[in-house]
């Protein structure tokens, strides 16, 4: 699990210096953080309990240092591998070694290694078999006295045996064959030159165009990609979702995607001055070789690089969107410990009903049929509410959710019992998971799913950590991005959120415990086993009795674990056990006990923090301690507020232009936000419709789970599209052109909420086009 101890090698001084410059930090901040990471400290622990050591670095900065150090380590490992390969083949010289040691990126290393990389048989190697390397060297020198034709004539008739496995003797037949072979040797030399590659790379990075076109004969089959049938735009400005959309079309053999220069001759002109040094016959041969090298070897190599580079950038953008959305969902306000009746709506098989106690324990389950056995369903639900003293009702927002909600509201329950629609994304995946089978081995999938819906209302964080984050449905193109990078980012997000909230050690599941700083799946399971065997923990100190939870793990975890009702009230706070003596001294100096100090704000106000500053404990930690004493174990999540959709609006057909409706943001992407207005398919608020002012990043305006008011701009039932706006005066019914906004929605009961892709923005060379069907991405965004 990502939250376990993170061991790194001791920091390299050169890496520390360079990283301090890159991140604009002081050297001691990077060095201290790197040292803590090397000793096994976690990101949450370092940022929360080692502020004096790091100079107040936050989680983002600590994680950046960790990730960059890993990248630098990977570069060093590749450097060592290259040096070993060159030494083994006796190709290493002092100048080359110095250049390799000075290379700071993998790209620079690979450019240096390119001429020496073992390669397959090429046109240049064939020319060398013909004995033409001396001719290539002669031409490359560009001596005015050199006559290329005469020099080539000397090689005509040269006998050689091609290394093609056939071993049939051959000869150089003509002068042109000799010159062509010499140019091939020069061309390969040019293509492997680090300066040539660097120059052309810069040209591609600044001017390259990404384009796509439909494969001939696939026009009908590829209809979902028709926005990209004939598309081009500057690569440097291409948004991540468009890059990923084109790549997906290519992977599905619908599109051809290219990254090219607007003018290939510009690439040749950039490289040519490095090699063409004279205007004479020999120089002309070199010029021809450079042009060939650029078009045949360098440009394809740069295209491959740019494709990978743009994919990496697009992945990073998409992963950030996913992680940001996930954080908001995990931080969603919890209902808290209340008795809940949870309902998983269904028509054919009925609505599965479960009753949960205040700790989320399953007490009872049943099935009701509001659509065809309304009287019986009403009697059952009313009986459940009364018998189990229900304090809230949770209803899944899937098919039949609004109808079920209307039925429950019609029961006339007390106003003190909120009826809440709960996002059920991922509930079905949880119900079939090993975690669910372990929790409820004697119940079927429908019961497990309903329990998950109820618990998600009570404590979203505790329930969502049981799911694979990718199944929650708040990303864009999550199946197209680098899966290891995605997992790392999402794990970091879960770890950050779990530790930011804190975990009650006596009630937390092993899944939740496994994300606590310093713990892992094995230790978490041992904590639960010890809890089941000997009863609730009475203090944090008792955690040391848990198998495999040693002093280091205790140091990293203790501050994030809460023991409610412990003898020492500090055990229920975020004050780390290592700081207990400080609190005890503060209390003693005021003639108080620790509990008295925690209760009496007027006494705490008298504490002079400077008095307690030591070599290891400074004002940042002391300030945190006093703040925690005021609200021990406080939950940083917002207070729960019930939300209701508009009555009478249950399906897309109920929507009318100009309607103003309450909605819940379900997904935020780079191009806008998807909003649930209670009609079983989400509408899109395009980035241009999020506010009256310009919005660059949708995430700066809206977050998943946020309650918003929207205006219905357009409803296209045949195309399953709903366009919404958050502007104060939206233009109703406007056919929003490229970049202005595109409605998107669920394509049916099984389609995920959100995750669509708008058509690309119009490039200057194309006329405006009408919106096309873009809902396909919503369906593609999850595996079928």
Q: Can you say where each PLM-predicted feature lies in the sequence?
A:
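Accessory alpha-helical DNA-binding modules that contact the DNA backbone or grooves
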Residues: 42-43, 54, 58-165, 169, ...
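Long, charged amphipathic helices and adjacent flexible linkers at domain junctions
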Residues: 305-323, 436, 471-504, 609-657
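C-terminal accessory/binding modules appended to enzymatic or scaffolding proteins
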Residues: 24-25, 333-335, 495-529, 647-685, ...
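Long, charge-rich intrinsically disordered scaffolds of nucleic-acid metabolism proteins
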Residues: 108, 112, 420, 426, ...
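Duplex nucleic acid-engaging cores and interfaces of nucleic-acid transaction enzymes
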Residues: 45, 58-64, 71-342, 346-443, ...
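Single-stranded RNA-binding regions, centering on S1/OB-family and related RNA-binding modules
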Residues: 561-784
């Amino acid at each position: 699990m990502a939250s376990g101890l993170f061991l790194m090698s001791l920091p390299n001084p050169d890496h520390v210096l360079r990283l301090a410059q890159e991140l604009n930090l002081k050297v001691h901040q990077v060095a201290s953080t790197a040292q803590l990471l090397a000793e096994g400290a976690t990101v949450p622990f370092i940022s929360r309990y080692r502020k004096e050591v790091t100079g107040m670095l936050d989680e983002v900065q600590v994680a950046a240092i960790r990730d960059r150090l890993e990248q630098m380590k990977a570069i060093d490992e590749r450097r060592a591998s290259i040096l070993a390969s060159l030494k083994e083949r006796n190709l290493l010289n002092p100048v080359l070694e110095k250049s390799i040691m000075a290379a700071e990126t993998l790209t620079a290393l690979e450019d240096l290694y390119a001429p020496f990389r073992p390669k397959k048989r090429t046109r240049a190697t064939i020319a060398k078999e013909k004995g033409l390397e001396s001719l290539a060297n002669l031409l490359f020198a560009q001596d005015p006295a050199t006559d290329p034709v005469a020099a080539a004539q000397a090689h005509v008739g040269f006998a050689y045996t091609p290394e093609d496995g056939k071993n049939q003797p051959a000869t150089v037949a003509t002068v042109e064959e000799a010159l062509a072979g010499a140019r091939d040797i020069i061309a390969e030399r040019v293509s492997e030159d680090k300066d040539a590659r660097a120059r052309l790379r810069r040209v591609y990075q600044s001017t390259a165009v990404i384009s796509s076109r439909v494969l001939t004969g696939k026009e009908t089959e590829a209809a979902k990609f028709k926005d990209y049938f004939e598309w081009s735009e500057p690569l440097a400005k291409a948004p991540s979702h468009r890059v990923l959309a084109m790549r997906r079309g290519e992977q599905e053999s619908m599109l051809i995607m290219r990254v090219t220069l607007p003018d290939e001759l510009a690439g040749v002109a950039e490289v040519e001055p490095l090699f063409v040094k004279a205007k004479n016959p020999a120089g002309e041969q070199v010029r021809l070789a450079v042009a060939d090298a650029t078009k045949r070897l360098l440009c394809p190599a740069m295209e491959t690089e740019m494709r990978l580079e743009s994919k990496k950038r697009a992945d990073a953008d998409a992963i950030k969107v996913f992680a940001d959305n996930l954080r908001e969902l995990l931080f969603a306000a919890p209902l808290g410990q209340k008795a809940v009746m949870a309902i998983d709506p269904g028509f054919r098989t009925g609505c599965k009903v479960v009753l949960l106690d205040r700790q989320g324990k399953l007490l009872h389950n049943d099935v009701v049929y509001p659509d065809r056995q309304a009287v019986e369903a009403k009697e059952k639900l009313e009986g459940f509410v009364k018998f189990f003293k229900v304090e809230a009702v949770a209803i899944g927002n899937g098919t039949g959710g609004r109808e079920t909600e209307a039925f429950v509201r019609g029961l006339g329950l007390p106003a003190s019992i909120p009826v809440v629609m709960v996002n059920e994304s991922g509930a079905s995946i949880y119900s079939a998971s090993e975690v669910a089978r372990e929790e409820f081995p004697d119940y079927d999938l429908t019961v497990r799913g309903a329990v998950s819906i109820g618990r998600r209302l009570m404590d979203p964080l505790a329930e969502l950590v049981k799911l694979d984050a990718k199944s929650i449905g708040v990303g864009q193109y999550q199946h197209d991005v680098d899966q290891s990078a995605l997992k790392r980012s999402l794990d970091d997000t879960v770890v950050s959120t779990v530790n930011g909230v804190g975990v009650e050690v006596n009630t937390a599941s092993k899944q939740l415990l496994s994300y606590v700083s310093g713990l892992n799946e094995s230790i978490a399971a041992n904590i639960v086993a010890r809890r089941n065997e000997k009863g609730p923990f009475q203090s944090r100190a008792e955690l040391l009795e848990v198998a495999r939870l040693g002093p280091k793990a205790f140091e990293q975890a203790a501050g994030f674990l809460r023991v409610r009702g412990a003898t020492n009230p500090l055990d229920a706070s975020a004050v780390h056990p290592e700081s207990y003596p400080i609190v005890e001294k503060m209390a003693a100096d005021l003639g108080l006990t620790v509990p008295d100090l925690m209760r009496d704000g007027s006494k705490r106000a008298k504490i002079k923090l400077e008095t307690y500053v030591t070599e290891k404990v400074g004002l940042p930690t002391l300030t945190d301690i006093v703040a925690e004493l005021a609200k021990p174990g406080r939950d940083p999540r917002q207070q729960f507020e019930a939300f209701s959709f508009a009555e009478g609006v249950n399906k897309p057909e109920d929507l009318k232009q100009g309607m103003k409706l309450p909605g819940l943001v379900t997904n935020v992407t780079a191009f806008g936000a998807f909003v649930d207005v209670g009609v079983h398919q989400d509408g899109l608020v395009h980035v241009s419709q999020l506010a009256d002012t310009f919005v660059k990043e949708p995430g700066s305006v809206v977050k998943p789970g946020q309650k918003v008011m929207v205006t219905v701009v357009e409803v296209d039932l045949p195309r399953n599209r709903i366009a919404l706006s958050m502007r104060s005066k939206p233009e109703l019914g406007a056919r929003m052109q490229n970049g202005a906004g595109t409605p998107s929605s669920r394509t049916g009961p099984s389609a995920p909420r959100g995750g669509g892709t708008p058509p690309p923005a119009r490039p200057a060379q194309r006329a405006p086009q009408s919106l096309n069907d873009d809902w396909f991405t919503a369906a593609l965004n999850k595996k079928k």
